[in-house]
């Protein structure tokens, strides 16, 4: 599933095409994806102007001049694909409709944005912009890891007395939103903290080091266009390439990349997800 860097990469690719654009025509080609689409979604989108394109956690939020916000969740395999007349200095013709093109937005400037989702774990919803923080997918989210509210004091307090493993705690979207398996594994390796360690038993000074490390990992991943392991593509269709710099994720049995460390990377399943770590460097 796309994590924060992949979603932010897609948002940045869409922003030049969607922000300020009027949706001249919207087409919805099926009644649902993971959940049913809102009533009359195509009609409510047609004629609306996108005033801002934002990201919250792993969701893209398109604010409309109608007072509604379009929430987009990419799910496991969802892609937002741009074609048409305006993508910076590029020109992409509209491709023939594909089997899994579920939502199509045509702008008045000649661009087309297509939401393609083969597995149909993605979602779209419309909500009142003024009360969007109360939407059931958004209301319990913790602070953004790249925002000021995510700081050392917050994380130390969130971990205090917590019995779950540190990796599980970091994946808890109520503690910090947007983090996923890949980037938590990478951040814990950089911090030298085992994903198996009980969160509440890690010294506060070590917990505090996670904040800048998490920010660095996410920032580097965004700059690299995210990680393309299976389905992720940027809005222009390009692959991300952060996967080429992984230090632990997906490297089971390979040598740790810490200088002078001869240990091999281990994999352990935690809460249904694979954790990758070095047993020597991460304590």
From Swiss-Prot:
One GO term of the biological process aspect: base-excision repair
Pfam families assigned: Fapy_DNA_glyco, H2TH
EC number: 3.2.2.23, 4.2.99.18
Binding note for cofactor: Binds 1 zinc ion per subunit.
Annotated catalysed reactions: Hydrolysis of DNA containing ring-opened 7-methylguanine residues, releasing 2,6-diamino-4-hydroxy-5-(N-methyl)formamidopyrimidine; 2'-deoxyribonucleotide-(2'-deoxyribose 5'-phosphate)-2'-deoxyribonucleotide-DNA = a 3'-end 2'-deoxyribonucleotide-(2,3-dehydro-2,3-deoxyribose 5'-phosphate)-DNA + a 5'-end 5'-phospho-2'-deoxyribonucleoside-DNA + H(+)
UniProt keywords, alphabetically: DNA damage, DNA repair, DNA-binding, Glycosidase, Hydrolase, Lyase, Metal-binding, Multifunctional enzyme, Zinc, Zinc-finger
UniProt-annotated catalytic positions: 2-3, 58, 273
Binding, DNA: 100, 119, 162
Named cofactor requirement(s): Zn(2+)
Stretches annotated zinc finger (FPG-type): 247-283
GO molecular function, a single term: 8-oxo-7,8-dihydroguanine DNA N-glycosylase activity
Function (record text): Involved in base excision repair of DNA damaged by oxidation or by mutagenic agents. Acts as a DNA glycosylase that recognizes and removes damaged bases. Has a preference for oxidized purines, such as 7,8-dihydro-8-oxoguanine (8-oxoG). Has AP (apurinic/apyrimidinic) lyase activity and introduces nicks in the DNA strand. Cleaves the DNA backbone by beta-delta elimination to generate a single-strand break at the site of the removed base with both 3'- and 5'-phosphates.
Subunit structure: Monomer.
NCBIfam families hit by this protein: fpg, PRK01103.1
Family indicated by similarity: Belongs to the FPG family.
UniProt-recorded name of the protein: Formamidopyrimidine-DNA glycosylase
UniProt organism field: Jannaschia sp. (strain CCS1)
């Amino acid at each position: 599933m796309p994590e924060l860097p992949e979603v932010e990469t897609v948002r940045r690719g869409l922003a030049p095409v969607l922000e300020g654009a009027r949706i001249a025509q919207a087409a919805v080609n099926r009644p649902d994806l993971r959940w049913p689409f809102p009533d009359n979604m195509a009609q409510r989108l047609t004629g609306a102007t996108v005033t801002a394109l934002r990201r919250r956690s792993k969701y893209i939020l398109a604010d409309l001049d109608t007072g509604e916000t379009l929430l987009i969740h990419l799910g496991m395999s969802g892609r937002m694909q741009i074609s048409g007349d305006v993508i910076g200095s590029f020109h992409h013709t509209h491709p023939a409709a594909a089997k899994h093109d579920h939502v199509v937005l045509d702008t008045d400037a000649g661009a087309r944005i297509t939401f393609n989702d083969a597995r149909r774990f993605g979602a779209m919803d419309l909500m009142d912009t003024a009360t969007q923080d109360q939407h059931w997918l958004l209301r319990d989210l913790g602070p953004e890891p790249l925002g000021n509210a995510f700081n050392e004091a917050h994380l130390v307090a969130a971990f205090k007395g917590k019995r779950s493993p540190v990796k599980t705690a970091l994946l808890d979207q109520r503690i910090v939103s947007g983090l996923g398996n890949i980037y938590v594994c990478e951040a814990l390796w950089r911090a030298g903290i085992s994903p198996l360690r009980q969160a509440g038993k890690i010294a506060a000074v070590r917990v505090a080091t996670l904040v800048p490390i998490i920010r660095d990992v996410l920032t580097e991943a965004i700059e690299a266009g995210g990680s393309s392991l299976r389905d992720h593509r940027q809005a222009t269709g390009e692959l991300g390439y952060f996967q080429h710099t992984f230090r632990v994720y997906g490297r089971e049995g390979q040598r740790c990349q810490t200088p002078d460390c001869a240990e091999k990377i281990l994999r352990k399943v935690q809460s249904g997800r694979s954790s990758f770590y070095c047993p020597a460097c991460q304590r």
